[in-house]
Curated annotation (Swiss-Prot):
Family indicated by similarity: Belongs to the RcsA family.
Entry coiled-coil feature ranges: none
Summary of the function given for this chain in its UniProt record: Component of the Rcs signaling system, which controls transcription of numerous genes. Binds, with RcsB, to the RcsAB box to regulate expression of genes.
Gene Ontology BP annotations: regulation of DNA-templated transcription
Naturally occurring in which organism (per UniProt): Salmonella typhimurium (strain LT2 / SGSC1412 / ATCC 700720)
UniProt key word Nucleus: no
Domain HTH luxR-type per the UniProt entry, residue ranges: 131-196
GO molecular function: DNA binding
Subunit-structure text: Interacts with RcsB.
NCBIfam families to which the protein is assigned, alphabetical: PRK15411.1
Protein name: Transcriptional regulatory protein RcsA
Length: 207
């Protein structure tokens, strides 16, 4: 199983490599790279099953973010796991934001990786591994409300603008927190911004 690790932190690279080797991946199938250009070449050459990327490797340069987005789209059979670069926040969850794109905390546990990668690690030639996770999506109301919330508007302002009761706004906020698996506003904003960066945004259910 070919894998790519794009993370400037040697501690993380070592941890991920150790995890993969312990699960039967051969060392020669684990490729460390540093730049987005190298990632594009490596994905084309190796057709990896899984790519681990630290968002710090691309988030500060719009052209790099755009290229990451293209690479993810060009390799639908590769699972991309993007680690959030967010400090001093307890969040060890992960979210599937596209069929082949997962946003994760760096604090993800080996057991969680086993759950996510189990089928892929066991994958025999010609059998595609899949992730049994719902893709993150919001209703139109939740999506509109989340944007206002991120603009710094409070419950009453959102209630007035959307012409709904404050209690309903609070209920929608609760749904958003449940779907993004955190009550931490900083993490919610971070997930939204990162998803916007490498996709066209969190899926909105148009029904």
């Amino acid at each position: 199983m070919s894998t790519i690790i794009m993370d400037l932190c040697s501690y993380t690279r070592l941890g991920l490599s150790g995890y993969l080797v312990s699960r039967g991946v051969k060392k020669r199938e684990i490729n460390d790279i540093e730049t987005v250009d190298e990632l594009a070449i490596a994905c084309g050459a190796h057709q990896p099953s899984v790519v681990f990327i630290n968002e710090d490797c691309f988030i500060h340069t719009p052209s790099d973010s755009q290229q990451i987005k293209q690479i993810i789209n060009q390799h639908p059979d590769t699972l991309f796991i993007v680690f959030m670069a967010i400090a001093n926040v307890h969040f060890d969850e992960y979210l599937l934001v596209r069929k082949n794109l997962l946003i994760s905390s760096k604090s993800i546990k080996p057991d969680s990786l086993d759950t996510l990668l189990g089928d892929i690690l066991k994958k025999e030639s010609g059998i595609s591994g899949t992730i049994n996770l719902p893709t993150l999506s919001l209703s139109r109301t939740e999506s509109s409300m989340l944007r206002m919330w991120m603009e710094g508007q409070g419950t009453i302002q959102i209630s007035d603008r959307m012409n709904i009761k404050a209690k309903t706004v609070s209920s929608h906020k609760g749904n958003i927190k449940r779907k993004i698996k955190t009550h931490n506003k900083q993490v919610i904003y971070h997930v939204v911004r990162l998803t916007d960066n490498v996709t066209n945004g969190i899926f909105v259910n148009m029904r």
